[in-house]
């Protein structure tokens, strides 16, 4: 590839920050809010024009199960707070058994919530702005500025041109490990199937909403690619995308939007409308940190001394996991940390970590870790994890699951439940 030499003096933003959060998805929102509640000056940078990431802009508006499939809630903390907030101002679908908290009697019905993505986006923005978090929209992080393995800050690109922002702790929650990769942190790329969905309405769905008096009934899904989580339905011979290059992202979007058009073009044109296309590529796994530990599918029912939160399998009942702090860090990088989709998990464990509730809990942990690192003067890769666990626990996060929740009936443990579609 040809190269050119390019050099310029980049202005430095007058304000420096304790914590700079790159990425306004649910993990980034959780990290930013946690650090701000601890009194830190926080900058949240989002490349699009709304908060929420895949949960809002990406139209994957589902809190997957936060319980064990037998009526016991596992995931609490900011995940519970955000779930309740997501349904406060817009339409909501929560199973009746869970509308008032954990049910009094065991149930196989799982604790999920579907919500209005756009109303959640604007309501959470109002919430964060009132909390005093500084937010930059339509701004891309183009590069970290490194001093060895220490990140001095980030080069930003926006309507003001290029500028540099300083931060004591940098949290990469871009979803694609963009900062980590460019900082030289070891990373691992994923592969994504031919999957794409958008939201629309039809005459039939609108009639149903009128009859039910529930606007949620008006909303239907339209699909481009229809491959499932495991690749079922992925066209033979079609390549997978890792989503880490401009060409890959563009090819994914072009193929899927063309397929969507082919599917709807012959329908009566007055009978349906696409209300919104996803504002980002709906990749599941693109690039993540090669962390100090990598969570594996077979780690279910395993306890970790450095757990930052217990989580559950969103497809299989009973399967419980703990997220070790080491999935967010890489030793030697003293002020870089990640969370959410960029956390270190392989195979199906990566899928477990990337969905909304676990992403929020790991984001909450990253925010708390940033606070501890700043207050103690230690590197974020060497903080007192027991202090982090105490902070998480004080914020209603279950650190270790109770072994009493491990079923003795191995035949029913791990049963797959409802198919939650494109997640």
Task: Describe each PLM feature range.
Residues 13-17, 27-28, 162-163:
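Ligand-binding pocket scaffold of soluble enzyme catalytic domains
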Residues 28-29, 51-54, 105, 144, ...:
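Flexible loop/turn segments at secondary-structure boundaries
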Residues 1-19:
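Extreme N-terminal leader/targeting segments of oxidoreductases
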Residues 145-152:
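A short, glycine/Asx- and small/polar-enriched loop/turn
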Residues 6, 54-56, 78, 121, ...:
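Flavin (FAD/FMN)-binding glycine-rich loop and adjacent Rossmann-like elements that form
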Residues 26, 114-118, 382:
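Soluble non-cytosolic domains of exported or imported proteins
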Residues 19-42:
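N-terminal Rossmann-like FAD-binding beta1-loop-alpha1 element of flavoenzymes
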Residues 8, 34, 40-41, 47-143, ...:
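Conserved N-terminal/central alpha/beta ligand/cofactor-binding core
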């Amino acid at each position: 590839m040809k190269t050119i030499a390019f050099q310029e003096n980049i202005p430095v933003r007058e304000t420096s920050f304790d914590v700079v959060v790159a990425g306004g998805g649910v993990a980034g929102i959780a990290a930013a809010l946690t650090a701000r509640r601890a009194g830190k000056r926080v900058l949240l940078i989002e490349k699009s024009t709304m908060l929420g990431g895949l949960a809002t802009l990406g139209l994957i508006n589902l809190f997957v199960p936060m319980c064990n499939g037998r009526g016991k809630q596992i995931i609490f903390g900011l995940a519970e707070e955000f779930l309740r907030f997501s349904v406060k101002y817009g339409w909501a679908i929560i199973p009746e058994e869970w509308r008032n908290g954990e049910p009094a009697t065991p149930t196989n019905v799982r604790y999920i919530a579907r919500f209005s993505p756009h109303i959640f986006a604007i309501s959470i923005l109002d919430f964060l702005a009132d909390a005093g978090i500084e937010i930059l929209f339509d701004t891309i992080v183009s590069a970290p500025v490194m001093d060895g393995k220490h990140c001095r800050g980030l080069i930003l690109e926006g309507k003001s041109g290029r500028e540099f922002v300083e931060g004591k702790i940098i949290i990469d929650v871009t979803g694609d490990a963009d900062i980590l990769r460019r900082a030289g942190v070891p990373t691992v790329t994923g592969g994504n199937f031919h999957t794409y969905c958008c939201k629309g309405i039809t005459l039939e769905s609108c009639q149903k909403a009128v009859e039910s008096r529930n606007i949620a009934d008006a909303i239907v899904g339209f699909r481009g690619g229809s491959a499932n989580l495991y690749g079922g339905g992925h066209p033979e011979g079609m390549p997978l995308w890792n989503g880490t290059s401009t060409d890959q992202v563009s090819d994914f979007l072009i193929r899927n939007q063309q397929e969507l058009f082919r599917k709807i073009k012959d329908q009566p044109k007055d009978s349906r409308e696409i209300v919104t296309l996803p504002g980002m590529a709906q990749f599941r796994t693109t690039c993540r940190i090669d962390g100090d530990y990598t969570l594996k599918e077979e780690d279910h029912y395993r306890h970790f001394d450095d757990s930052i939160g217990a989580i559950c399998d969103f497809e299989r009942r009973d399967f419980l996991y703990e997220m070790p702090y080491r999935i967010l860090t890489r030793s030697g990088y003293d002020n870089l940390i990640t969370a959410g989709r960029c956390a270190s998990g392989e195979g199906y464990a990566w899928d477990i970590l990337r969905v909304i509730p676990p992403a929020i809990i790991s984001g909450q942990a990253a925010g708390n870790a940033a606070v501890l690192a700043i207050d103690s003067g230690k590197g974020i890769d060497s903080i007192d994890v027991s202090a982090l666990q105490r902070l998480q626990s004080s914020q209603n996060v279950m650190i270790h699951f109770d072994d009493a929740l491990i079923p003795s009936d191995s035949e029913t443990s791990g049963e797959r439940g409802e198919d939650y579609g494109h997640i």
